[in-house]
Amino acid sequence: YRHRPIPSTFTASSNWPEWLSEDQRVADGRADVLTYETEPLAADVTVSGAIAAHLFASTSGTDSDWIVKLIDVYPEQYDADPKMGGYEFMVANDVLRGRFRKGYSDPAPAVPNHVDEYTVDMHTQCYRFLKGHRIMVQVQSTWFPLIDRNPQKFVPNIFAATDADFQVARQRVFRSSYLDFPVDTSRVVQ
């Protein structure tokens, strides 16, 4: 996908306290957001523990942000609360600025179009995806204005980037990428 570090990836009416529970359909279907989704779950699935996304990816630039979101997709017909039909509720998320893929003490530019592993720590969660819901993963490279814009070019201080530093970049995520999370089988409900 091509990423331009400009458009917002959440609604204009968003406020700081609300962004964590905002419906993620605002990003679903965008050309600069990759979306992966399961079929409706046949049974409840409880995720309990550390979650990490392992992206094998490349950028045509020399820096890029990698944002990964784990989402609970409600059924389109949700009788318990009809306004929640199809709602995409964010369960876990985080951002990795590509320059820090080798550690925060060793920022380094990416080699353009070279596949690197980017590990996005999505922290520890305990969450039950209910039967009939879907599990979704979204991958994107901007979360502006929640997260400051990355110029897609390695600069010593991103906050001092000039207009000339900002460039369009092509991000690629490869099939060997995966999301690692523990499923608590002691809490399986059929």
Which sequence ranges carry the predicted segments?
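C-terminal, loop-rich substrate-recognition/catalytic regions characterized by aromatic stacking residues
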Residues: 1-190
